[in-house]
Amino acid sequence: MAYVLLVAYKDKKMNDGLNMAFSPENIESSHDVFVSLFGELKIYTSHGILREADLKSPKISRLLTYLLISGKKAHSSLEIAQALWPDDLTNPAKNMRNLIYRLRQTFGLISEKELIVSTASGYQFNPDLHIMTDYQQFDDLIQLASKASSVINRVELLKNAIDLYCGKILSSADGEHWLIQFAAKYHIAYVGAVNELLKQLNALHSYDLLNQYAARSLAIVPENSRGYYWLIHSLKVQGMDELASNEYQLAKQHLTTEEYKELCTSLGDSCE
């Protein structure tokens, strides 16, 4: 009994921490800024939201993303230009001033603060702002899920993490050298989280949720063989053989020949 109470207490504290997490829904202060990078760039403040298209500049969206993920506080104009636009290093200081001016005008629509400031060390995010990102929140939720004492709480935490992921980090810059490693890290983490969630939902016989999350994840990562495995398994358990057959066809389109054969074998089908 004491152990059960301890588990319940730990899970309650975990959920309390989750509910207090900084997100677009609970921004209150004018100093709070939430930046979403999964899929497209979005910036939230207490006064509204800026979408990537509102910035009207691929360079500005790349600048903001680079400053967020670089792990360094401030960067010189030349350093930024060399990282993002190595083929265009003509007058980087002037070009950066122009970008910052345009950003200031646009960000001014949803905040009286400056988002990026110039310092003796270079350009950086305004230290007076409290900035949180979706990928940081994703990390926090995955860490909490790994420590959850109950399957139910683990499932809820994984669901919340997975719901944040709408595609690769700044998908409009997908494949650019400065972003590849960082984006791949979260793409792989997302696939791992999805596969764990589907496994847990199957154990709970929550087939409707399993179908929902598997289908959504396969729209984002159609090459995830485990996503097809759990979805087809769930459909077969529910007697939905025609839908399962349709998923087999989709799997055949997106998986390698070897992956498809392994999928069929693991599900006990010949797939001839």
Model-assigned labels for residue ranges:
Residues 28-36, 98-129, 255-264:
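DNA-binding patch around the recognition helix
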Residues 37-40, 55-65, 89-110:
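DNA-recognition element of transcription regulators
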